[in-house]
């Protein structure tokens, strides 16, 4: 996305290896986690609104008998807009201001939240809540691992990003093949890849904190982009887990 995105963090100096005890780092990471948590709250509220308020729901979804029967052209715009925004930001935002980074974060979170109304219409509320709890638990454990491990995870970054590209290609292929086996493999790999990205991005944020040298503006930007990375990882893990734990509406 910019200098704060994947690949910008260099190796950690040996004298900074024990970063888990740094109070400044803990404060920085807490800011990231708080932003992710608030983003999930906003997304949940928007998902509920777009699935439960008829005037809003009908702008995005075609519902028959209380079940999702299709989507509208506006939904397609909302669903793909976050990807477009991230691509534009990746090429255009080299030294963004904190306000710009914050606006980008909340815009993407809002768009994704609105599109998640489809999840509320497709799966039962109980299964969505249970899967969210499983995702939150897994996210906490994986991020804690990335935060505390002394193993350098940098080498996994390229592998994981190649995996994401592979998932996108496989998902497009599955639309035409309609193979249950391929879909199952995609869902399994999706869980594994985004689990790895949660740990990887957490450690990457630690590296970034030390590279910024305490600059407040840089940390504000990094907080927004770091939260965005972890938020997207969470949402993707949640959706892949729903393929296993989600109960379809009757």
From Swiss-Prot:
The chain crosses the membrane at residues 36-56, 73-93, 101-121, 128-148, 156-176, 180-200, 225-245. Coiled coil: none annotated. It is found in: Cell membrane. One of its GO terms (cellular component) is plasma membrane. It holds the Pfam family Bax1-I. It is a multi-pass membrane protein. Keywords: Cell membrane, Membrane, Transmembrane, Transmembrane helix. InterPro entries: Bax_inhibitor_1-related (IPR006214). Belongs to the BI1 family. This is Uncharacterized protein CC_3663. It comes from Caulobacter vibrioides (strain ATCC 19089 / CIP 103742 / CB 15).
């Amino acid at each position: 996305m910019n200098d704060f995105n994947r690949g910008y963090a260099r190796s950690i100096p040996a004298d900074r290896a024990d970063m888990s005890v740094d109070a400044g780092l803990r404060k920085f990471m807490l800011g990231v986690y708080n932003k992710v948590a608030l983003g999930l709250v906003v997304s949940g509220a928007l998902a509920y609104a777009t699935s439960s308020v008829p005037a809003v729901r009908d702008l995005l979804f075609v519902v028959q008998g209380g079940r999702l029967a299709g989507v509208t052209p506006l939904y397609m715009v909302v669903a793909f807009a976050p990807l477009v925004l991230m691509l534009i930001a990746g090429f255009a935002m080299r030294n963004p201001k904190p306000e710009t980074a914050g606006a980008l974060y909340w815009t993407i979170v809002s768009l994704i939240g609105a599109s998640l109304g489809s999840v509320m219409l497709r799966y039962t509320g109980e299964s969505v809540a249970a899967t969210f709890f499983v995702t939150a638990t897994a996210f906490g454990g994986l991020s804690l691992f990335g935060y505390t491990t002394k193993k350098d995870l940098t080498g996994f970054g390229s592998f994981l990003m190649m995996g994401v590209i592979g998932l996108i290609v496989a998902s497009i292929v599955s639309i035409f093949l309609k193979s249950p086996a391929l879909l199952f493999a995609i869902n399994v790999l999706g869980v594994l890849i985004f689990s790895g990205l949660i740990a990887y991005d957490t450690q990457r944020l630690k590296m970034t904190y030390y590279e910024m040298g305490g600059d407040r503006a840089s940390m504000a930007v990094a907080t927004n982009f770091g939260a965005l990375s972890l938020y997207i990882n969470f949402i993707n893990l949640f959706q892949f887990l729903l393929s296993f734990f989600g109960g379809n509406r009757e």
